[in-house]
Amino acid sequence: MNTVKTVRELRAAVARARGEGKRIGFVPTMGNLHSGHAALVTKAAQRADFVVASIFVNPLQFGANEDLDKYPRTLAADQERLLQAGCNLLFAPAVEEMYPDGMSVQTRVSVPQLSEGLCGASRPGHFEGVATVVSKLFNMVQPDLAVFGEKDFQQLAVIRAMVRDLNMPIQIIGEPTVRADDGLALSSRNGYLTPEQRTAAPALYRTLQHIAAGIGRGQRDFAALVAEGQAQLSAAGFRPDYLEVRHAVSLRPALIDDRDLVVIAAAYLGNTRLIDNLYLHLEEKTA
């Protein structure tokens, strides 16, 4: 696996692979990789002949009081994990390579509606930063397909909409969330948790399961289910940011006749903000 740091080197390497008739897969990351990221690369390797991954901690998607400076940078370990997962090329640019004229004059990509609410409410500008950097990376790599984790459910919806609306010829593949044995979704931010917080953390997924089970039994008072869930989270030591039942495609608030739903949440455990979601498809209407 080669590692390149400039757009020129990246494009030359991808052009060679494409010249050999290879299908290009792409996995953008911010590094500090875990088994969830490895699953994305493995999926890309199954669907493509040449896999490009990127590691770039994107300042444009971090708010003023967020963890940009303390976000872990673990390049050597990340390179080994990518190699084991089947990555062929790593693009690891500096901020100056991605934003040569500075971020203040950078053209932005904004996906309305889907970027609003949920994580967009508590992290204003976040999804504009995500859409902008992913759009730039897509133009740099020009992949046939790209793989994103379903744990970042709203992000995946934003990327799908951007690709559709801007007519990008890229297949977007969602990969199911990878979880620890106790149900906690794998996340780079789990490393911020104290041992006690790590023990409490699986309550987030259990709460989503509780709400989904109620819906599966035919309960349609979503507000009551959410209130129960918020009480569960608070009892487990969380400070809920949001906990909602939404339509899984449009992300609007769920209606009682919707068949495709997502129970989606963000909550703080100490100073660490965890997110998770649970998709459910209802086969038939419940009276």
Curated annotation (Swiss-Prot):
(R)-pantoate binds at Q61, Q155. It comes from the Bacteria. It catalyses: (R)-pantoate + beta-alanine + ATP = (R)-pantothenate + AMP + diphosphate + H(+). Its EC number is 6.3.2.1. GO terms for molecular function: ATP binding; pantoate-beta-alanine ligase activity. The active site is at H37 (proton donor). Beta-alanine binds at Q61. ATP binds at residues 30-37, 149-152, 178, 186-189. It is an enzyme of class 6 (ligase). GO terms for biological process: pantothenate biosynthetic process. It is found in: Cytoplasm. Pathway: Cofactor biosynthesis; (R)-pantothenate biosynthesis; (R)-pantothenate from (R)-pantoate and beta-alanine: step 1/1. Pfam families: Pantoate_ligase. InterPro entries: Pantoate_ligase, Pantoate_ligase_C, Rossmann-like_a/b/a_fold. The keyword Translocase does not apply. GO terms for cellular component: cytosol. Keywords: ATP-binding, Cytoplasm, Ligase, Nucleotide-binding, Pantothenate biosynthesis. Homodimer. The reaction proceeds by a bi uni uni bi ping pong mechanism. PANTHER family: CYTIDYLATE KINASE/PANTOATE-BETA-ALANINE LIGASE, PANTOATE--BETA-ALANINE LIGASE. Belongs to the pantothenate synthetase family. Catalyzes the condensation of pantoate with beta-alanine in an ATP-dependent reaction via a pantoyl-adenylate intermediate. This is Pantothenate synthetase. It comes from Pseudomonas putida (strain GB-1).
